[in-house]
């Protein structure tokens, strides 16, 4: 004999969660280092951002494409400005503590050292390209950008020094 077919029942369990529950920003998961900006390296990073912004906006507001050397200055200024903003966010949010696989002291030393060398070359190129005879309309902007480029170079030199001290103390341990 054939067995009678039973009715099958399906149980469906549904759960719901909101985006905010999964990615809450409680104080334990989101770190913010307010004191970093009060340190000398923090102050130098902010100065690099402000002065670097002045360098490339003063040049970008002119007809810089007529002088090929300003292309190099623009590249260095914009490239390191973006990366410095990126590093400031990493330091303020303490992201470096959540990614311990990255040797942050070495990365900081390489970044600041390369920024110092390339910004120094860009500042020298900027200063040597400024001439009132070449384009008197843009002379003041280019001269000011040259001045600020040297100030940014000094800031990167300072941060290179602090990065070297941190790197050296880290490698000695």
From Swiss-Prot:
Is DNA-binding one of the keywords?
no
Extract one GO BP annotation from the record. chemotaxis
Molecular-function GO term, any one: structural constituent of myelin sheath
Under Pfam families, the record lists:
MARVEL
Q: Record's Gene Ontology CC terms?
A: cytoplasm; extracellular space; membrane; nucleoplasm
- Entries under PROSITE patterns matching the protein: MARVEL (PS51225)
Domain (MARVEL) ranges = 36-168
Where does the sequence pass through the membrane? Answer: 40-60, 70-90, 105-125, 147-167
Query: Which UniProt keywords are given for this protein, alphabetically ordered?
Result: Chemotaxis, Cytokine, Cytoplasm, Membrane, Nucleus, Transmembrane, Transmembrane helix
What the record says about family reads: Belongs to the chemokine-like factor family.
Would you tell me the protein name for this molecule?
CKLF-like MARVEL transmembrane domain-containing protein 8
Name the source organism.
Answer: Homo sapiens
Phylogenetic lineage: Eukaryota, Metazoa, Chordata, Craniata, Vertebrata
